[in-house]
Protein backbone atom coordinates (compact mmCIF):
# COMPACT_ATOMS: atom_id res chain seq x y z
CA UNK A 1 0.00 0.00 0.00
CA UNK A 2 1.25 3.47 -0.91
CA UNK A 3 0.94 6.43 1.45
CA UNK A 4 -1.59 9.01 0.25
CA UNK A 5 0.97 11.82 -0.11
CA UNK A 6 4.02 11.94 -2.35
CA UNK A 7 7.27 13.59 -1.29
CA UNK A 8 10.06 15.43 -3.06
CA UNK A 9 12.73 13.97 -0.78
CA UNK A 10 12.73 11.11 1.72
CA UNK A 11 15.51 10.95 4.31
CA UNK A 12 16.12 7.61 6.00
CA UNK A 13 17.66 7.90 9.46
CA UNK A 14 17.36 10.51 12.21
CA UNK A 15 20.99 10.80 13.30
CA UNK A 16 23.36 13.69 12.65
CA UNK A 17 23.47 13.15 8.88
CA UNK A 18 19.75 12.55 8.51
CA UNK A 19 18.65 15.56 10.53
CA UNK A 20 20.87 17.96 8.55
CA UNK A 21 19.74 16.44 5.24
CA UNK A 22 16.05 16.72 6.12
CA UNK A 23 16.35 20.27 7.43
CA UNK A 24 18.26 21.35 4.31
CA UNK A 25 15.67 20.08 1.83
CA UNK A 26 12.81 21.44 3.92
CA UNK A 27 14.48 24.87 4.05
CA UNK A 28 14.71 24.66 0.25
CA UNK A 29 10.88 24.54 0.39
CA UNK A 30 10.72 20.92 -0.75
CA UNK A 31 8.19 18.48 0.72
CA UNK A 32 10.38 16.26 2.88
CA UNK A 33 9.79 13.09 4.91
CA UNK A 34 12.20 11.96 7.62
CA UNK A 35 11.84 8.27 8.47
CA UNK A 36 13.33 6.96 11.70
CA UNK A 37 12.92 3.72 13.62
CA UNK A 38 12.45 5.75 16.83
CA UNK A 39 11.39 9.40 17.05
CA UNK A 40 12.65 9.57 20.65
CA UNK A 41 16.27 9.07 19.51
CA UNK A 42 16.37 11.84 16.88
CA UNK A 43 19.75 13.59 17.20
CA UNK A 44 21.07 10.93 19.58
CA UNK A 45 24.77 11.18 20.48
CA UNK A 46 25.53 7.47 20.26
CA UNK A 47 29.11 7.62 21.50
CA UNK A 48 31.06 10.49 23.05
CA UNK A 49 29.08 13.45 24.42
CA UNK A 50 31.05 16.13 22.56
CA UNK A 51 30.92 18.26 19.43
CA UNK A 52 33.90 19.77 17.62
CA UNK A 53 37.66 19.46 18.04
CA UNK A 54 40.57 19.69 15.60
CA UNK A 55 39.15 19.71 12.06
CA UNK A 56 35.74 18.71 13.40
CA UNK A 57 35.07 22.18 14.81
CA UNK A 58 35.80 23.57 11.35
CA UNK A 59 33.10 21.29 9.91
CA UNK A 60 30.59 22.45 12.53
CA UNK A 61 31.26 26.10 11.63
CA UNK A 62 30.83 25.29 7.92
CA UNK A 63 27.55 23.47 8.57
CA UNK A 64 26.39 26.53 10.51
CA UNK A 65 27.53 28.90 7.74
CA UNK A 66 25.19 27.02 5.41
CA UNK A 67 22.23 27.20 7.76
CA UNK A 68 22.70 23.81 9.44
CA UNK A 69 21.66 22.93 12.99
CA UNK A 70 24.67 21.30 14.67
CA UNK A 71 26.36 24.50 15.90
CA UNK A 72 23.14 25.85 17.42
CA UNK A 73 22.45 22.52 19.14
CA UNK A 74 25.99 22.51 20.56
CA UNK A 75 25.60 26.08 21.85
CA UNK A 76 22.35 25.22 23.61
CA UNK A 77 23.58 21.89 25.02
CA UNK A 78 27.28 22.58 25.66
CA UNK A 79 28.27 22.16 29.31
CA UNK A 80 31.98 22.82 28.79
CA UNK A 81 33.54 24.87 25.98
CA UNK A 82 37.19 25.05 25.02
CA UNK A 83 39.21 26.53 22.18
CA UNK A 84 41.86 23.98 21.23
CA UNK A 85 45.24 25.14 19.86
CA UNK A 86 44.47 28.64 21.16
CA UNK A 87 48.18 29.49 21.31
CA UNK A 88 48.71 28.49 17.67
CA UNK A 89 47.80 30.18 14.40
CA UNK A 90 44.18 30.81 13.38
CA UNK A 91 44.20 27.98 10.80
CA UNK A 92 44.33 25.23 13.44
CA UNK A 93 42.36 26.78 16.29
CA UNK A 94 39.28 24.70 16.96
CA UNK A 95 36.20 24.89 19.17
CA UNK A 96 35.07 21.88 21.21
CA UNK A 97 32.03 21.52 23.43
CA UNK A 98 31.22 18.86 25.98
CA UNK A 99 27.48 18.35 25.50
CA UNK A 100 24.52 17.32 27.60
CA UNK A 101 23.05 14.39 25.65
CA UNK A 102 19.46 15.07 26.71
CA UNK A 103 19.61 18.79 25.93
CA UNK A 104 21.24 18.14 22.56
CA UNK A 105 18.57 15.65 21.57
CA UNK A 106 15.84 18.07 22.69
CA UNK A 107 17.22 20.93 20.58
CA UNK A 108 17.38 18.68 17.50
CA UNK A 109 13.85 17.34 17.96
CA UNK A 110 12.36 20.80 18.52
CA UNK A 111 14.06 22.07 15.35
CA UNK A 112 12.79 19.13 13.30
CA UNK A 113 9.23 19.26 14.61
CA UNK A 114 8.96 23.00 13.96
CA UNK A 115 10.51 23.03 10.48
CA UNK A 116 7.99 23.86 7.73
CA UNK A 117 7.81 21.39 4.81
CA UNK A 118 9.11 18.52 6.99
CA UNK A 119 7.12 15.47 8.14
CA UNK A 120 8.48 12.83 10.52
CA UNK A 121 7.32 9.20 10.52
CA UNK A 122 8.41 6.37 12.83
CA UNK A 123 8.95 3.14 10.94
CA UNK A 124 11.87 0.95 9.89
CA UNK A 125 12.70 1.11 6.18
CA UNK A 126 13.21 -2.31 4.59
CA UNK A 127 13.62 -1.56 0.88
CA UNK A 128 14.42 1.12 -1.68
CA UNK A 129 11.92 1.15 -4.58
CA UNK A 130 13.56 1.46 -7.99
CA UNK A 131 12.37 1.82 -11.56
CA UNK A 132 15.22 0.81 -13.87
CA UNK A 133 18.19 2.75 -12.44
CA UNK A 134 16.22 5.47 -10.67
CA UNK A 135 14.84 5.66 -7.14
CA UNK A 136 11.09 6.22 -6.81
CA UNK A 137 10.44 5.62 -3.13
CA UNK A 138 10.85 3.33 -0.13
CA UNK A 139 9.04 0.48 1.62
CA UNK A 140 8.68 0.12 5.39
CA UNK A 141 8.53 -2.90 7.68
CA UNK A 142 4.74 -2.60 8.01
CA UNK A 143 4.37 -2.76 4.20
CA UNK A 144 3.55 0.93 3.80
CA UNK A 145 5.28 2.51 0.81
CA UNK A 146 6.19 6.14 0.21
CA UNK A 147 6.85 7.73 -3.18
CA UNK A 148 9.63 10.30 -3.62
CA UNK A 149 11.69 11.86 -6.38
CA UNK A 150 14.87 11.46 -4.34
CA UNK A 151 16.04 9.45 -1.31
CA UNK A 152 18.87 10.21 1.12
CA UNK A 153 20.09 7.17 3.07
CA UNK A 154 21.80 7.92 6.40
CA UNK A 155 21.79 4.53 8.12
CA UNK A 156 24.76 5.06 10.46
CA UNK A 157 25.94 1.79 12.04
CA UNK A 158 22.54 0.12 11.63
CA UNK A 159 23.08 -1.77 8.34
CA UNK A 160 23.60 -5.40 9.39
CA UNK A 161 24.98 -4.05 12.66
CA UNK A 162 26.50 -6.62 15.02
CA UNK A 163 27.39 -5.76 18.62
CA UNK A 164 30.33 -7.52 20.31
CA UNK A 165 30.98 -7.80 24.06
CA UNK A 166 33.70 -10.35 24.64
CA UNK A 167 33.09 -13.43 22.52
CA UNK A 168 29.32 -12.89 22.65
CA UNK A 169 27.66 -10.99 19.81
CA UNK A 170 24.18 -10.14 18.62
CA UNK A 171 22.41 -8.02 15.98
CA UNK A 172 22.02 -4.36 16.88
CA UNK A 173 22.29 -0.88 15.38
CA UNK A 174 23.69 0.46 18.66
CA UNK A 175 23.04 -0.43 22.30
CA UNK A 176 19.28 -0.72 22.79
CA UNK A 177 18.37 -0.37 19.10
CA UNK A 178 17.73 -3.06 16.47
CA UNK A 179 19.92 -3.52 13.41
CA UNK A 180 18.58 -2.82 9.94
CA UNK A 181 18.94 -6.33 8.52
CA UNK A 182 16.38 -6.41 5.69
CA UNK A 183 17.50 -3.10 4.19
CA UNK A 184 21.13 -4.21 4.37
CA UNK A 185 20.27 -7.37 2.40
CA UNK A 186 18.41 -5.37 -0.25
CA UNK A 187 21.25 -2.88 -0.62
CA UNK A 188 23.76 -5.69 -1.12
CA UNK A 189 21.80 -6.64 -4.26
CA UNK A 190 22.54 -3.25 -5.83
CA UNK A 191 25.49 -2.53 -8.09
CA UNK A 192 27.53 -1.03 -5.23
CA UNK A 193 30.67 -2.24 -3.47
CA UNK A 194 30.07 -3.03 0.19
CA UNK A 195 32.39 -3.93 3.06
CA UNK A 196 32.50 -3.96 6.87
CA UNK A 197 33.88 -1.46 9.37
CA UNK A 198 34.00 -1.47 13.14
CA UNK A 199 33.76 1.14 15.85
CA UNK A 200 33.49 0.96 19.61
CA UNK A 201 32.46 2.78 22.75
CA UNK A 202 33.60 2.66 26.39
CA UNK A 203 31.56 1.53 29.39
CA UNK A 204 29.57 4.27 31.15
CA UNK A 205 30.28 4.79 34.83
CA UNK A 206 28.01 5.86 37.71
CA UNK A 207 29.30 9.28 38.86
CA UNK A 208 28.16 8.55 42.44
CA UNK A 209 30.77 5.78 42.68
CA UNK A 210 33.74 7.89 41.49
CA UNK A 211 36.10 9.57 43.98
CA UNK A 212 36.42 12.93 42.22
CA UNK A 213 38.23 14.48 45.21
CA UNK A 214 41.53 12.81 44.30
CA UNK A 215 41.33 13.51 40.56
CA UNK A 216 42.60 16.46 38.54
CA UNK A 217 39.89 18.80 37.26
CA UNK A 218 39.75 20.22 33.76
CA UNK A 219 37.70 23.37 33.39
CA UNK A 220 36.46 24.98 30.21
CA UNK A 221 37.73 28.32 28.92
CA UNK A 222 37.10 31.37 31.06
CA UNK A 223 36.17 33.32 27.92
CA UNK A 224 33.52 31.00 26.50
CA UNK A 225 33.45 30.53 22.72
CA UNK A 226 30.28 29.95 20.70
CA UNK A 227 29.79 27.69 17.69
CA UNK A 228 27.02 29.40 15.76
CA UNK A 229 27.29 32.72 13.95
CA UNK A 230 23.85 33.47 15.39
CA UNK A 231 24.71 32.02 18.81
CA UNK A 232 25.62 33.69 22.09
CA UNK A 233 27.23 32.77 25.41
CA UNK A 234 23.84 33.39 27.05
CA UNK A 235 22.51 30.28 25.28
CA UNK A 236 25.01 28.02 27.08
CA UNK A 237 23.65 26.01 30.01
CA UNK A 238 25.56 25.62 33.29
CA UNK A 239 29.27 24.93 32.75
CA UNK A 240 30.89 22.04 34.65
CA UNK A 241 34.39 20.47 34.76
CA UNK A 242 35.70 17.18 33.44
CA UNK A 243 38.16 15.04 35.40
CA UNK A 244 41.34 13.20 34.48
CA UNK A 245 42.64 9.79 35.52
CA UNK A 246 45.17 7.39 33.97
CA UNK A 247 45.59 3.74 33.15
CA UNK A 248 48.53 2.03 34.87
CA UNK A 249 50.55 -1.19 34.89
CA UNK A 250 47.72 -3.05 36.64
CA UNK A 251 45.26 -1.92 33.94
CA UNK A 252 47.58 -3.05 31.17
CA UNK A 253 48.22 -6.43 32.83
CA UNK A 254 44.46 -7.08 33.02
CA UNK A 255 44.12 -6.32 29.31
CA UNK A 256 47.10 -8.44 28.20
CA UNK A 257 45.92 -11.43 30.24
CA UNK A 258 42.48 -11.35 28.61
CA UNK A 259 43.30 -10.83 24.95
CA UNK A 260 42.17 -14.41 24.29
CA UNK A 261 38.67 -13.19 25.19
CA UNK A 262 38.82 -10.15 22.91
CA UNK A 263 36.73 -10.41 19.70
CA UNK A 264 39.31 -8.24 17.95
CA UNK A 265 42.33 -10.33 18.85
CA UNK A 266 40.62 -13.69 18.30
CA UNK A 267 39.45 -12.79 14.79
CA UNK A 268 35.74 -12.67 15.60
CA UNK A 269 35.62 -9.03 14.45
CA UNK A 270 36.72 -8.63 10.84
CA UNK A 271 35.86 -4.96 10.31
CA UNK A 272 38.61 -2.35 10.56
CA UNK A 273 38.31 0.15 13.42
CA UNK A 274 39.10 3.89 13.56
CA UNK A 275 42.84 4.62 13.51
CA UNK A 276 42.52 7.81 15.57
CA UNK A 277 40.16 6.46 18.21
CA UNK A 278 41.64 3.03 19.03
CA UNK A 279 40.30 0.71 21.69
CA UNK A 280 42.20 0.45 24.97
CA UNK A 281 43.26 -3.06 23.89
CA UNK A 282 44.82 -1.59 20.75
CA UNK A 283 46.58 1.18 22.67
CA UNK A 284 48.12 -1.22 25.16
CA UNK A 285 49.42 -3.53 22.40
CA UNK A 286 50.45 -0.91 19.83
CA UNK A 287 52.10 1.39 22.38
CA UNK A 288 53.60 -1.28 24.60
CA UNK A 289 56.41 1.06 25.68
CA UNK A 290 53.92 3.31 27.48
CA UNK A 291 52.93 2.43 31.04
CA UNK A 292 50.06 4.92 31.22
CA UNK A 293 47.35 6.50 29.08
CA UNK A 294 45.37 9.61 30.03
CA UNK A 295 41.62 9.07 30.45
CA UNK A 296 39.11 11.94 30.52
CA UNK A 297 36.03 11.45 32.68
CA UNK A 298 33.36 13.40 30.81
CA UNK A 299 29.91 14.02 32.33
CA UNK A 300 27.06 13.02 30.01
CA UNK A 301 24.77 15.78 31.21
CA UNK A 302 23.59 18.07 33.97
CA UNK A 303 20.78 15.71 35.02
CA UNK A 304 22.57 12.39 34.48
CA UNK A 305 24.87 10.37 36.71
CA UNK A 306 26.50 8.72 33.70
CA UNK A 307 30.15 9.48 33.02
CA UNK A 308 31.90 8.79 29.72
CA UNK A 309 35.52 7.60 30.28
CA UNK A 310 37.08 8.92 27.07
CA UNK A 311 40.00 6.67 26.17
CA UNK A 312 38.91 3.18 27.21
CA UNK A 313 36.70 2.11 24.31
CA UNK A 314 36.61 -1.68 24.56
CA UNK A 315 34.89 -4.87 23.46
CA UNK A 316 36.39 -7.06 26.20
CA UNK A 317 33.98 -9.10 28.37
CA UNK A 318 32.08 -7.27 31.10
CA UNK A 319 34.05 -8.81 33.99
CA UNK A 320 37.28 -7.60 32.36
CA UNK A 321 35.79 -4.15 31.82
CA UNK A 322 35.05 -3.98 35.55
CA UNK A 323 38.67 -4.85 36.39
CA UNK A 324 39.97 -2.24 33.93
CA UNK A 325 37.78 0.50 35.42
CA UNK A 326 38.51 -0.42 39.05
CA UNK A 327 42.27 -0.47 38.43
CA UNK A 328 42.39 3.30 37.84
CA UNK A 329 42.81 6.08 40.39
CA UNK A 330 39.49 7.44 41.64
CA UNK A 331 37.61 4.52 40.09
CA UNK A 332 38.54 1.83 42.60
CA UNK A 333 34.90 1.50 43.68
CA UNK A 334 33.29 2.66 40.46
CA UNK A 335 30.27 0.87 39.07
CA UNK A 336 29.55 0.38 35.37
CA UNK A 337 25.99 1.21 34.31
CA UNK A 338 26.40 0.44 30.59
CA UNK A 339 29.01 -1.98 29.24
CA UNK A 340 31.36 -0.94 26.48
CA UNK A 341 31.08 -2.73 23.15
CA UNK A 342 32.29 -2.85 19.56
CA UNK A 343 29.93 -2.76 16.60
CA UNK A 344 30.50 -4.02 13.06
CA UNK A 345 28.38 -2.62 10.24
CA UNK A 346 28.10 -2.38 6.46
CA UNK A 347 29.51 0.59 4.60
CA UNK A 348 29.59 1.31 0.89
CA UNK A 349 32.69 2.25 -1.06
CA UNK A 350 32.42 6.05 -1.40
CA UNK A 351 34.23 5.87 -4.75
CA UNK A 352 30.88 4.68 -6.11
CA UNK A 353 29.46 8.13 -5.31
CA UNK A 354 29.54 11.37 -7.24
CA UNK A 355 30.96 14.40 -5.40
CA UNK A 356 27.33 15.36 -4.73
CA UNK A 357 27.00 12.11 -2.71
CA UNK A 358 24.56 10.71 -5.26
CA UNK A 359 25.27 7.09 -6.12
CA UNK A 360 26.70 6.65 -9.61
CA UNK A 361 24.61 3.52 -10.19
CA UNK A 362 21.18 4.77 -9.09
CA UNK A 363 19.79 8.15 -10.07
CA UNK A 364 18.30 10.12 -7.18
CA UNK A 365 19.76 7.93 -4.41
CA UNK A 366 22.16 9.72 -2.06
CA UNK A 367 24.30 8.31 0.78
CA UNK A 368 25.55 10.30 3.79
CA UNK A 369 27.36 9.57 7.06
CA UNK A 370 28.92 6.37 8.34
CA UNK A 371 27.45 4.44 5.42
CA UNK A 372 30.20 6.18 3.39
CA UNK A 373 33.01 5.00 5.67
CA UNK A 374 33.40 8.03 7.93
CA UNK A 375 33.44 8.28 11.71
CA UNK A 376 32.21 11.17 13.83
CA UNK A 377 29.07 13.23 14.31
CA UNK A 378 30.55 16.23 12.50
CA UNK A 379 31.61 14.29 9.41
CA UNK A 380 28.15 12.72 9.25
CA UNK A 381 26.34 16.05 9.64
CA UNK A 382 28.48 17.67 6.93
CA UNK A 383 27.68 14.88 4.49
CA UNK A 384 24.00 14.99 5.42
CA UNK A 385 23.87 18.69 4.65
CA UNK A 386 25.59 18.23 1.28
CA UNK A 387 23.49 15.20 0.32
CA UNK A 388 20.32 17.07 1.31
CA UNK A 389 21.28 20.10 -0.76
CA UNK A 390 21.96 17.99 -3.82
CA UNK A 391 18.87 15.83 -3.38
CA UNK A 392 16.93 19.10 -3.37
CA UNK A 393 18.70 20.40 -6.46
CA UNK A 394 18.13 17.03 -8.17
CA UNK A 395 14.39 17.25 -7.54
CA UNK A 396 14.31 20.80 -8.90
CA UNK A 397 16.36 19.73 -11.93
CA UNK A 398 18.95 22.37 -11.06
CA UNK A 399 22.71 22.13 -11.37
CA UNK A 400 24.31 20.23 -8.48
CA UNK A 401 26.74 21.85 -6.04
CA UNK A 402 29.66 20.69 -3.93
CA UNK A 403 32.52 22.69 -2.40
CA UNK A 404 36.08 22.54 -3.71
CA UNK A 405 39.03 21.50 -1.54
CA UNK A 406 40.13 25.14 -1.30
CA UNK A 407 36.60 26.24 -0.37
CA UNK A 408 35.69 24.11 2.65
CA UNK A 409 36.66 21.16 4.82
CA UNK A 410 33.41 19.63 3.57
CA UNK A 411 35.05 19.76 0.13
CA UNK A 412 38.20 18.06 1.44
CA UNK A 413 36.13 15.35 3.13
CA UNK A 414 34.02 14.56 0.07
CA UNK A 415 36.92 14.73 -2.38
CA UNK A 416 39.00 12.36 -0.23
CA UNK A 417 36.11 9.90 0.01
CA UNK A 418 34.95 9.99 -3.61
CA UNK A 419 38.42 10.05 -5.16
CA UNK A 420 40.60 7.91 -2.91
CA UNK A 421 37.99 6.02 -0.89
CA UNK A 422 38.72 4.58 2.54
CA UNK A 423 39.36 1.17 4.08
CA UNK A 424 39.11 2.42 7.67
CA UNK A 425 36.75 4.88 9.39
CA UNK A 426 37.69 8.31 7.99
CA UNK A 427 37.84 11.45 10.11
CA UNK A 428 38.74 15.02 9.23
CA UNK A 429 41.95 16.69 10.42
CA UNK A 430 43.32 20.13 9.56
CA UNK A 431 46.37 18.31 8.15
CA UNK A 432 44.19 16.84 5.38
CA UNK A 433 43.64 20.31 3.87
CA UNK A 434 46.27 21.79 1.55
CA UNK A 435 44.93 25.33 2.00
CA UNK A 436 44.08 25.37 5.70
CA UNK A 437 45.04 29.03 6.19
CA UNK A 438 42.05 29.85 3.99
CA UNK A 439 39.79 27.25 5.64
CA UNK A 440 39.67 28.64 9.16
CA UNK A 441 36.84 28.31 11.67
CA UNK A 442 36.55 32.09 11.88
CA UNK A 443 35.85 32.68 8.17
CA UNK A 444 33.45 29.79 7.45
CA UNK A 445 30.59 32.24 6.96
CA UNK A 446 32.63 34.40 4.57
CA UNK A 447 33.42 31.32 2.49
CA UNK A 448 29.98 29.71 2.40
CA UNK A 449 27.05 31.85 3.52
CA UNK A 450 26.59 33.67 0.20
CA UNK A 451 26.46 30.31 -1.59
CA UNK A 452 23.99 28.96 0.97
CA UNK A 453 21.77 32.01 0.48
CA UNK A 454 21.56 31.32 -3.26
CA UNK A 455 20.65 27.70 -2.48
CA UNK A 456 17.76 28.85 -0.30
CA UNK A 457 19.27 27.79 3.05
CA UNK A 458 19.77 31.16 4.78
CA UNK A 459 16.93 33.20 6.28
CA UNK A 460 16.63 36.98 6.09
CA UNK A 461 17.73 37.61 9.69
CA UNK A 462 21.02 35.74 9.32
CA UNK A 463 21.58 37.24 5.87
CA UNK A 464 21.18 40.80 7.20
CA UNK A 465 23.56 40.17 10.08
CA UNK A 466 26.11 38.56 7.75
CA UNK A 467 26.00 41.55 5.38
CA UNK A 468 26.41 43.94 8.31
CA UNK A 469 29.52 42.05 9.39
CA UNK A 470 30.96 42.17 5.86
CA UNK A 471 30.28 45.91 5.69
CA UNK A 472 31.94 46.45 9.08
CA UNK A 473 35.06 44.60 7.91
CA UNK A 474 35.34 46.66 4.74
CA UNK A 475 34.69 50.00 6.46
CA UNK A 476 37.26 49.30 9.18
CA UNK A 477 39.92 48.29 6.67
CA UNK A 478 39.25 51.45 4.69
CA UNK A 479 39.52 53.50 7.89
CA UNK A 480 42.85 51.94 8.91
CA UNK A 481 44.24 52.43 5.40
CA UNK A 482 43.24 56.07 5.42
CA UNK A 483 44.89 57.06 8.72
CA UNK A 484 48.60 57.85 8.34
CA UNK A 485 51.32 58.33 10.92
CA UNK A 486 54.56 60.03 9.84
CA UNK A 487 57.88 60.64 11.66
CA UNK A 488 56.94 64.30 12.33
CA UNK A 489 53.50 63.49 13.71
CA UNK A 490 52.46 64.87 17.09
CA UNK A 491 51.54 61.28 18.02
CA UNK A 492 54.98 59.85 17.17
CA UNK A 493 56.15 59.48 20.78
CA UNK A 494 52.91 57.73 21.75
CA UNK A 495 53.42 55.22 18.93
CA UNK A 496 57.15 54.69 19.53
CA UNK A 497 56.49 53.71 23.15
CA UNK A 498 54.84 50.49 21.98
CA UNK A 499 56.94 49.80 18.87
CA UNK A 500 60.06 47.64 19.01
CA UNK A 501 61.72 49.86 16.40
CA UNK A 502 60.88 53.58 16.01
CA UNK A 503 59.07 54.91 12.97
CA UNK A 504 61.37 56.22 10.25
CA UNK A 505 58.81 56.44 7.43
CA UNK A 506 55.15 57.24 6.97
CA UNK A 507 52.83 54.28 7.71
CA UNK A 508 49.08 53.72 7.85
CA UNK A 509 47.04 51.66 10.30
CA UNK A 510 47.33 48.46 8.28
CA UNK A 511 51.13 48.81 8.12
CA UNK A 512 51.31 49.10 11.90
CA UNK A 513 48.96 46.16 12.45
CA UNK A 514 51.30 43.95 10.40
CA UNK A 515 54.01 44.43 13.03
CA UNK A 516 54.23 41.39 15.36
CA UNK A 517 54.16 43.51 18.53
CA UNK A 518 50.91 45.23 17.54
CA UNK A 519 47.40 43.81 17.71
CA UNK A 520 44.10 45.52 16.98
CA UNK A 521 43.47 46.37 20.63
CA UNK A 522 46.88 48.04 21.00
CA UNK A 523 46.54 49.87 17.68
CA UNK A 524 43.12 51.32 18.44
CA UNK A 525 44.32 52.50 21.86
CA UNK A 526 46.60 54.97 20.01
CA UNK A 527 44.98 58.39 19.66
CA UNK A 528 44.98 58.59 15.82
CA UNK A 529 43.33 55.16 15.46
CA UNK A 530 40.58 55.51 18.06
CA UNK A 531 37.88 54.30 18.48
CA UNK A 532 37.97 50.51 18.25
CA UNK A 533 35.17 48.80 16.35
CA UNK A 534 32.60 47.06 18.58
CA UNK A 535 31.91 44.12 16.23
CA UNK A 536 34.35 41.54 17.65
CA UNK A 537 33.87 39.05 14.80
CA UNK A 538 34.64 41.75 12.23
CA UNK A 539 37.69 42.81 14.27
CA UNK A 540 39.02 39.24 14.15
CA UNK A 541 38.66 39.17 10.35
CA UNK A 542 40.36 42.54 9.94
CA UNK A 543 43.32 41.50 12.10
CA UNK A 544 43.82 38.09 10.46
CA UNK A 545 43.42 39.47 6.92
CA UNK A 546 46.08 42.13 7.55
CA UNK A 547 48.58 40.11 9.61
CA UNK A 548 48.48 37.06 7.33
CA UNK A 549 48.02 38.94 4.06
CA UNK A 550 51.25 37.69 2.47
CA UNK A 551 50.60 34.05 3.38
CA UNK A 552 46.97 34.24 2.26
CA UNK A 553 47.91 35.77 -1.10
CA UNK A 554 50.55 33.06 -1.59
CA UNK A 555 47.96 30.31 -1.00
CA UNK A 556 45.49 32.00 -3.33
CA UNK A 557 48.12 32.17 -6.08
CA UNK A 558 48.84 28.48 -5.52
CA UNK A 559 45.12 27.71 -5.82
CA UNK A 560 44.88 29.64 -9.08
CA UNK A 561 47.79 27.65 -10.51
CA UNK A 562 46.15 24.41 -9.41
CA UNK A 563 42.77 25.50 -10.78
CA UNK A 564 44.19 25.81 -14.28
CA UNK A 565 43.24 22.19 -14.85
CA UNK A 566 41.57 21.24 -11.53
CA UNK A 567 38.08 21.80 -12.94
CA UNK A 568 38.78 20.57 -16.45
CA UNK A 569 35.85 18.23 -16.96
CA UNK A 570 36.22 14.65 -18.17
CA UNK A 571 33.10 13.39 -20.01
CA UNK A 572 31.26 10.59 -18.22
CA UNK A 573 31.57 8.34 -21.28
CA UNK A 574 35.25 9.08 -21.98
CA UNK A 575 36.98 6.00 -23.45
CA UNK A 576 40.32 5.55 -21.65
CA UNK A 577 41.10 2.26 -23.41
CA UNK A 578 41.68 3.99 -26.75
CA UNK A 579 44.30 6.42 -25.41
CA UNK A 580 47.79 5.38 -26.41
CA UNK A 581 50.47 5.98 -23.80
CA UNK A 582 48.40 5.08 -20.74
CA UNK A 583 49.59 1.98 -18.90
CA UNK A 584 47.13 -0.85 -18.33
CA UNK A 585 47.19 -0.10 -14.58
CA UNK A 586 46.40 3.61 -15.07
CA UNK A 587 43.71 2.81 -17.63
CA UNK A 588 42.09 0.27 -15.29
CA UNK A 589 42.02 2.74 -12.38
CA UNK A 590 40.53 5.51 -14.50
CA UNK A 591 37.89 3.10 -15.81
CA UNK A 592 37.14 1.97 -12.26
CA UNK A 593 36.91 5.40 -10.58
CA UNK A 594 35.52 7.39 -13.52
CA UNK A 595 36.80 10.78 -12.26
CA UNK A 596 34.69 13.78 -13.27
CA UNK A 597 37.63 16.18 -13.58
CA UNK A 598 41.38 16.30 -14.14
CA UNK A 599 41.82 17.43 -10.53
CA UNK A 600 39.98 14.38 -9.24
CA UNK A 601 41.92 12.09 -11.58
CA UNK A 602 45.23 13.49 -10.31
CA UNK A 603 44.39 12.49 -6.73
CA UNK A 604 43.75 8.83 -7.54
CA UNK A 605 46.57 6.70 -6.16
CA UNK A 606 48.86 5.57 -8.99
CA UNK A 607 47.80 8.22 -11.53
CA UNK A 608 51.09 9.91 -12.49
CA UNK A 609 51.64 13.50 -13.73
CA UNK A 610 52.65 11.95 -17.08
CA UNK A 611 49.27 10.20 -17.29
CA UNK A 612 47.50 13.50 -16.56
CA UNK A 613 49.45 15.18 -19.38
CA UNK A 614 48.41 12.41 -21.81
CA UNK A 615 44.78 12.82 -20.70
CA UNK A 616 44.90 16.58 -21.31
CA UNK A 617 46.42 16.14 -24.77
CA UNK A 618 43.72 13.65 -25.75
CA UNK A 619 40.89 15.76 -24.35
CA UNK A 620 42.19 18.66 -26.43
CA UNK A 621 42.52 16.50 -29.56
CA UNK A 622 38.93 15.32 -29.21
CA UNK A 623 37.65 18.86 -28.63
CA UNK A 624 36.58 18.02 -25.07
CA UNK A 625 38.90 20.37 -23.17
CA UNK A 626 36.32 22.32 -21.21
CA UNK A 627 36.92 23.98 -17.88
CA UNK A 628 34.39 23.67 -15.09
CA UNK A 629 33.10 26.59 -13.13
Curated annotation (Swiss-Prot):
GO terms for biological process: tRNA methylation; tRNA wobble uridine modification. It is found in: Cytoplasm. The keyword tRNA processing applies. FAD binds at residues 13-18, 125, 180, 370. It comes from the Bacteria. One of its GO terms (molecular function) is flavin adenine dinucleotide binding. The keyword Flavoprotein applies. Homodimer. Heterotetramer of two MnmE and two MnmG subunits. Belongs to the MnmG family. This is tRNA uridine 5-carboxymethylaminomethyl modification enzyme MnmG.
